[in-house]
């Protein structure tokens, strides 16, 4: 459905856009070139493609975000596809305002452009495949003018990447990336190339895995990638040229194809397909595997050589390639893409060749900086050690205190115990002493209650010790002393006189008592 609608859009737009194709291509060159034209020193078309890609990829530049990207892809297509591809792409891209929502307009314009590009690229698929393979190399310098090589990388990409991407990359990239977000287009455009360029450009700047780039990128360039990417990347008709193509190519169908493939093709030609999609790559590869490989190898070499010429494309490409792989990287590298636009080729190329290394170096620098703090922290650690020593001393003191407390407790315990024992011994001694002083206190006499003195009245046998034998020594005077003799009776009264008269008894009454009676 989407493919047919895209074809219809292509047909409709081709009618009106072919007339606009030439102006729109220059506009991308003008708009995208200010930023990217210089970067693509090799060929203005490459710069334009890259610039338009960046613009398209970088909605940051609202003026040329998507219309330019569309136009730039057309420009790239112009080289690859003289008017048809450029016209459909430019009008479509213009009409399909990438800035607005690259999704439908871009998809349509891209669809139209893609359909045309598919038709024309299909016609030139072998060309595009070879140019695409050689994206930056020699193979299709005129057709594939990429950042890698003026015409070969880009146009070839426009054809191969674009034809397949125009359907899928442009539509998919314009739609998918626009769908994703202008930032993703920008960031993906720049970051796909940069993010993946750091990975693939730096990692594979020379590497570009030629075989892979032919395989994957060629596959991506071929129509199969378009269908696959349209299906795989986006439901959009020709949006899934690459999962990454959608991200990388969407940001810059031409630039991703061109820039990405010049840089990432020769650098990461395989990486773009890799990043984009194994399936897409596989499908694309069957279509033009060998030519792409050959061209990819050549383009890889060319792209490596024209890195100065294709710095912008390379950088945008490197930022864009990682888009689907690392959207975060895309966003992070969007500024780089913008920077490359403004600074044009030199920063991107330097970034392409160096960015990964530069990130690595900064990371190393950061570790160095961290190391310095670590050294400081080491010094702090020494201080901490001192503190620990102090703590240890305090701990020793504290430990001693607890031990002293324990010793004191033990001393108190023993002291208390000794005191109690002493008290008990003293009491016992006092008791014994008191017992000695009162020897009979505990003895009972045989008579129970009779005092011993009472029994002394009756004389007893001195040798009768039964009753008197005391347990202890008894003083002799007590035992032998006899009670004093009773006093003699008083003398009796003389008998009454016999011969006289009897004594008269007087009543003792008050009357009879004398007056002086008391």
Swiss-Prot record:
Keyword terms, alphabetized: Glycoprotein, Golgi apparatus, Membrane, Olfaction, Sensory transduction, Signal, Transmembrane, Transmembrane helix
Keyword Membrane belongs to the record: yes
Comp. bias (Pro residues): 138-153, 482-499
GO biological process assignments: non-motile cilium assembly; protein localization to non-motile cilium; sensory perception of smell
Region ranges (Disordered): 38-377, 477-518
Compositional bias (Basic and acidic residues): 92-106, 209-220, 236-247
Residue ranges crossing the lipid bilayer per the database entry: 410-430
Topological category with respect to the lipid bilayer: Single-pass type I membrane protein
Residue ranges, Cytoplasmic side: 431-518
Sequence ranges of Polar residues compositional bias: 168-180, 187-207, 248-270, 276-285
Leader sequence segment: 1-19
Localization: Golgi apparatus membrane
Residues exposed to the Extracellular side: 20-409
Any single GO CC term annotated in Swiss-Prot or TrEMBL for this entry: Golgi membrane
Glycosylation sites: 124, 156, 188, 220, 268
Function (record text): Required for proper function of the olfactory system. May be involved in establishing the acuity of olfactory sensory signaling.
UniProt cross-references to PANTHER family, sorted A to Z: GOLGI-ASSOCIATED OLFACTORY SIGNALING REGULATOR, PERIAXIN-LIKE
Name of protein: Golgi-associated olfactory signaling regulator
Native organism: Homo sapiens
